[in-house]
């Protein structure tokens, strides 16, 4: 799979133009991956940048979802390690939730890989706009007390979010954070830390299935993975130092811009 154009003819000017355009696309997606990982390591939502960006350069939906999962694994590994090293990964049932997220994502990925590209091209913009509206309208809970009656429901929620990540993905991290705050009453930093682990699990499950089915564009994924590592390291360090105060304004701005771009497209 070549991005974004296939070379036709043998004239040097055509070849030079092709190389220039392909290199430009790689450079743009590298930058996008860096900022997506930076944002995602703080509060989730990085897929709201990478997914539409890859679609806009002409990649098929399944190639987009597969390559996005591959490169995202590198960012989530980096941010998970940073939060763990700084003592924020304290959730006692983290391995249980990780398993739920992994299984849910696997089921979602198996489903999405059976859907035609034409259907995905119609569904993905709708899901993106819905996720963007969610970030804009939801103010987020503060001071929520732990609700023991909803723990069983929470297990289903973790599975469902994992399924969503395997089926589509953008906004998964933010949904996990909100679930831990609203249902379990965890604080924002602990919620963010466990979210990175669950997101890593769901990303990896989806990546394995997509890789087996041959949808991953490896060279593009590796280029974006380098940016993911740098962005996740920078973002998680920034979040650990500054906390929640900068997260929501960034997400709202990004969501608005993406919604406008998708509607125009």
Where are these regions (language model features)?
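Membrane-interface alpha-helices at helix entry/exit sites of multi-pass transporters
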Residues: 60-68, 91-93, 185-196
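Residue-level signature of transmembrane alpha-helical entry/exit and packing/kink sites
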Residues: 25-29, 93, 97, 121-124, ...
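Transmembrane helix exit motif
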Residues: 78-88, 117, 125-150, 259-265
